[in-house]
Amino acid sequence: MSGPVLSHLEQLEAESIQIFREVAAEFDNPVMLYSIGKDSSVLLHLARKAFYPGKIPFPLLHVDTDWKFREMIKFRDEAAVKYGFDLLVHKNPEGLAMGMNPFTFGSSKHTDVMKTEGLKQALNKYGFDAAFGGARRDEEKSRAKERVYSFRDSKHRWDPKNQRPELWHTYNGQVNKGESIRVFPLSNWTELDIWQYIYQENIDIVPLYFADYRPVVERNGTLIMVDDERMPLNEGEVPEQKLVRFRTLGCYPLTGAIESSATTLTGIIEEMLLSRSSERQGRVIDHDSSGSMEKKKREGYF
């Protein structure tokens, strides 16, 4: 006797929930990396479903670079109160002492110090042996190589040639001494799946994803939002109010906006169906040849 036929989104949801439950059962000290973006919002929703009516049995960790959009930090703090999850926030103290910023030090150095090293510091500090992340295989070519259980060595480095097979959705959680894993429950989701699921489940997301008039300047073909007074303007540069939104969120000086009139979820989904460009086209760090995504991941990046 066959069971009920699940829709595409229901199949993805069931797979992700299974991964959450399996890791929670197998590992001693898991954590969920919370970057506050749309994928993190879906990940949080799935984690709440996986353990309902109980509380999520692990904390959420935000590695704060000190350069996130103000609306992201506001959303993070409100979400922690609304959903009652344990929130850990870590900032690299050495980076803060250096006055690390993407303007003086460059995007690659800033990302390495405040994101990669900051993450490794937090993982070591709390002794986490498994870290959930919201990466998807459709985002970028190095992420397409990643397993659901992504093994990292004692220095949190990723070796794409030294990973475990995952046949028939069977995951090998046996880690060697000093190893840990990053876990990606959204591996098989696409950007369109994410937006359709957000619409279906009525998931809260940062308002920056919706079009609004915002102060931006254009640099090297990228629209950068001037989010606070710390952003140095070039000679003759004047922020212009444009109707824009963001497809991806990160440090505000390193995240490009797109011109858009999509003020609703249905509007965003309609844009998605017509889009022929990557959501990460607005990430300045992805265009830094000295800081490719695969190189960052090998060094311990998300």
Curated annotation (Swiss-Prot):
Enzyme Commission number(s): 2.7.7.4
Query: Which pathway?
Result: Sulfur metabolism; hydrogen sulfide biosynthesis; sulfite from sulfate: step 1/3
Q: Alphabetically list the UniProt keywords.
A: ATP-binding, Nucleotide-binding, Nucleotidyltransferase, Transferase
The family database entries (Gene3D superfamilies) matched by this protein are listed as: HUPs (3.40.50.620)
Q: What EC class does the entry list?
A: transferase
The reactions it catalyses are: sulfate + ATP + H(+) = adenosine 5'-phosphosulfate + diphosphate
Q: Which residues cross the membrane?
A: none
The protein's GO terms of the molecular function aspect are:
ATP binding; sulfate adenylyltransferase (ATP) activity
Q: Where is this region: Disordered?
A: 280-302
Asked if the keyword Nucleotidyltransferase belongs to this entry, the reply reads yes
Give the record's GO biological process terms: hydrogen sulfide biosynthetic process; sulfate assimilation
**Protein family (similarity comment):** Belongs to the PAPS reductase family. CysD subfamily.
- What function is annotated for this protein? With CysN forms the ATP sulfurylase (ATPS) that catalyzes the adenylation of sulfate producing adenosine 5'-phosphosulfate (APS) and diphosphate, the first enzymatic step in sulfur assimilation pathway. APS synthesis involves the formation of a high-energy phosphoric-sulfuric acid anhydride bond driven by GTP hydrolysis by CysN coupled to ATP hydrolysis by CysD.
Quaternary assembly: Heterodimer composed of CysD, the smaller subunit, and CysN.
* The name this protein goes by in its record: Sulfate adenylyltransferase subunit 2
